[in-house]
Design a protein with these regions (language model features):
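Short, Lys/Arg-enriched segments at the junction into DNA-binding effector domains
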Residues: 6-7, 119-181
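N-terminal/domain-start alpha-helical segments
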Residues: 1-128
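Conserved active-site beta-strand element of glycosyltransferases/polysaccharide synthases
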Residues: 232-234
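A structure-centric signal for secondary-structure junctions around beta-strands
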Residues: 5, 77, 90, 137-138, ...
Length: 235
């Protein structure tokens, strides 16, 4: 992983939490910029370059979901880690559907959060700096009937192109390379989220569900669930 200093946008309306996050990122050797509401976050993201966004959901002016959507309109690759006291499955799924890469439920420990930030940096570096490690072709490959474009982060069926998040693309590439193999949930989590990932396998299941929707595999004919083990790409 690249060790250069990163720049993190921290979007949090609670002053105490925002200052704690700013201090943690600065102490970790990176630059940090704070935003107190959704509108300020969108404005700052539009004029400055960031390597990661820590994004609270319950924000004044514009909520975190709308901020995530606006950021993804400008940049499909920057890692977005959502922060929220709303820990229900539907809240997490909505965040992932909008393009978030991770979801941390409050209250959280700063060590756990930094571990997730480090993992997000590593995944981004592997995708951006080492494209030769994972591609099926230079830029595109087929997954079933969907054409996957690695540069544009899209899955296209016919004339309809659907955007992919970085993790969704990594999952598709991994399934494609391991076609026919039964891949355990632990293997997939380690390969895509990193060995220090502290979440649950439910996050993986949610991502696979989103991937299935985007490649029109809701009947699980391409990505088969192997109960008690993981998944298998049989396309």
């Amino acid at each position: 992983m690249s060790t250069h200093q990163r720049k993190v946008l921290i979007v949090e309306d609670d002053p105490a939490i925002r200052e704690a996050l700013l201090e943690a990122i600065l102490s970790d050797g990176h630059a940090a910029v704070g935003a107190v509401d959704g509108a300020e976050a969108v404005r700052k993201f539009g004029v400055e370059a960031f390597d990661l966004v820590l994004l609270d959901i319950m924000l004044p002016v514009m909520n975190g979901y709308d901020v995530c959507r606006r950021i993804r309109e400008k940049d499909r690759r920057v890692p977005i880690v959502m922060l929220s006291a709303k820990g229900s499955e539907i809240d997490k799924v909505l965040g992932l559907e909008l393009g978030a890469d991770d979801y941390v439920t409050k209250p959280f420990g700063l060590r756990e959060l930094l571990a997730r930030v480090h993992a997000a940096f590593r995944r981004h570096d592997l995708l951006a700096e080492a494209p030769g490690a994972a591609p099926v072709t230079a830029d595109t490959f087929y997954f079933g009937a969907a054409l996957i474009d690695r540069r544009r982060f899209t899955a296209t069926r016919g004339d309809v192109a659907t955007e992919l998040t970085a993790r969704e693309l990594q999952l598709l590439e991994l399934f494609h390379r391991k076609r026919g193999e039964v891949l355990s949930r632990d293997f997939l989590l380690n390969a895509v989220w990193g060995i220090d990932y502290m979440g649950t396998t439910r996050t993986l299941d949610q991502h696979v569900a989103q991937v299935r929707k985007k490649i029109d595999d809701t009947a699980a004919k391409l990505i088969k669930t192997v109960h008690g083990v993981g998944y298998q790409y049989i396309g």
